[in-house]
Regions:
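N-terminal secretory signal peptides that target proteins for export/translocation
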Residues: 1-2
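Low-complexity, acidic/polar, glycine-enriched regions of mature
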Residues: 20-187
Length: 187
């Protein structure tokens, strides 16, 4: 009996002492969007998006233990113009044959009012750069019943030349404005 009670207390101690794990989420592709805009000749904006985006994230009470990762299939680029999309897919720009994905993996997460300050490694066109941005959101909802989800959004600006995409520099702007919005479904 004494051995059994010792075992029960040991199990209870392990349960209490075990660190809580982050809530893990998978991106809901029907509620995830990665869009961009870039200037053309300094006159107007070309708008586009990537249609194939996946990823996961973990939210921990200790924000420094939270994480975010994202993968974009470059062949899914869509600017509503097939000829332009084919050119953007070529070696002049994304070179989708050689670089089929754009990836982001967080390296540091900090809680801020209304969301998280996220720093991480963005790999695009064979170049990896450290980027930082603020994710806004984090409200939770249950929809449909029993499916727990949360969502975030951010806007950031990148220079395409920093990722080796400097073709047509006189015609197309260097700065690309990016908007990311996503919902995750709790695993």
């Amino acid at each position: 009996m004494r051995l059994m009670m010792t075992g029960v207390f040991a199990l209870a101690w392990v349960a209490v002492a075990a660190p809580a794990r982050a809530d893990e989420y998978a991106l809901d592709d029907s509620h995830t969007s990665v869009s961009f805009k870039i200037q053309h000749l300094g006159l107007s904006w070309v708008h586009g998006r990537f249609d194939d985006v996946s990823g996961t994230f973990g939210i921990d009470k200790d924000a420094s233990k939270s994480s975010f990762s994202l993968t974009i299939k470059t062949k899914s680029i869509d600017t509503n113009n097939k000829k332009r999309d084919d050119h953007l897919s070529s070696g002049d720009f994304f070179n989708i044959a050689q670089y089929p994905t754009i990836t982001f993996k967080s390296t540091a997460v900090k809680a801020v009012d209304g969301g998280y300050e996220v720093k991480g490694d963005l790999t695009m066109h064979g170049e990896t750069k450290s980027v930082s941005f603020t994710l806004k959101g984090g409200k939770e909802a249950e929809f449909p019943k029993g499916v727990h989800r949360t969502g975030f959004s951010t806007d950031l600006t990148l220079k395409r030349s920093e990722f080796g995409m400097d073709k047509l520099a006189n015609a197309i702007g260097d700065e690309v404005q990016i908007s990311i919005s996503f919902e995750g479904v709790k695993k």
